[in-house]
């Protein structure tokens, strides 16, 4: 029952990768504004526009400075989610006149430390700012973890919160999951040992019931907490 609208542009998005191109700022500025421009054409006015990371961070800024009082756009709320604060969409100030096209009154909202900072613009203008967990929301208020945005985040901390990612409990149900070796339930989880043994075999590990098997789904980057794993690794291996 959910309708999806897909926004495409061959010039900006028909590429081998998602980002990492010389014109990323222009590409995502286009996308962020096109999301708002398309609203009158799809016969649907959203209550909330949810934006994720710097690539869509201009949408709250565009909305508040250029669209909020226009007919058909009134009372839309914006939510901005920070997945990784290290990547903020930082570019030279010439982008304001050459690409962004925002009103002069809004330029201070996106300027930061002599540059243009997409993420700062979203933090300033979104109705709410969220992160992927309560602990991450707390961490990025600290200069050590904020990559320079702690001042603005502390000033806007009243609208900052962390929401843990959920899972689809039907899809990831061990009683019916087709992607595990043996199904089991909370009432009979002894078969879980069969999955451990099969995974050990698949990964060419010794098949030992007395050795814990620990997995971590993560990219190998610092903010994923690999330093915490390393700190306790000797204790794990030492038994």
Predicted regions and their residues:
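Catalytic cores of nucleotide-sugar-dependent glycosyltransferases that transfer UDP/GDP/TDP-activated
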Residues: 1-239
């Amino acid at each position: 029952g959910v309708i999806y609208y897909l926004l495409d542009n061959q010039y900006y998005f028909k590429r081998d990768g998602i980002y990492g191109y010389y014109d990323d700022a222009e590409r995502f500025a286009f996308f962020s504004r096109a999301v708002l421009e398309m609203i009158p054409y799809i016969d649907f006015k959203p209550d909330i526009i949810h934006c994720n990371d710097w690539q869509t961070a201009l949408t709250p800024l565009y909305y508040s400075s250029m669209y909020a009082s226009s007919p058909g756009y009134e009372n839309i709320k914006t939510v901005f989610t920070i997945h990784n604060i290290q990547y903020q969409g930082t570019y030279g100030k010439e982008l304001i006149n050459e690409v962004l096209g925002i009103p002069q009154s809004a330029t201070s909202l996106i300027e930061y430390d002599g540059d243009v900072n997409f993420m700062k613009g979203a933090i300033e203008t979104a109705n709410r700012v969220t992160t992927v967990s309560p602990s991450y929301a707390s961490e990025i208020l600290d200069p050590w973890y904020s990559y320079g945005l702690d001042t603005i985040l502390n000033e806007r901390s009243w609208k900052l919160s962390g929401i843990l990612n959920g899972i689809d409990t039907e899809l990831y149900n061990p009683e019916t999951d087709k992607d595990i070796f043996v199904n089991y339930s909370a009432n009979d989880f002894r078969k879980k040992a069969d999955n451990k043994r099969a995974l050990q075999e698949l990964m060419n590990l010794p098949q030992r019931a007395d050795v814990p098997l620990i997995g971590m789904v993560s990219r190998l980057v610092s903010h994923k907490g690999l330093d915490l794993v390393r700190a306790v690794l000797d204790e794990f291996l030492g038994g």
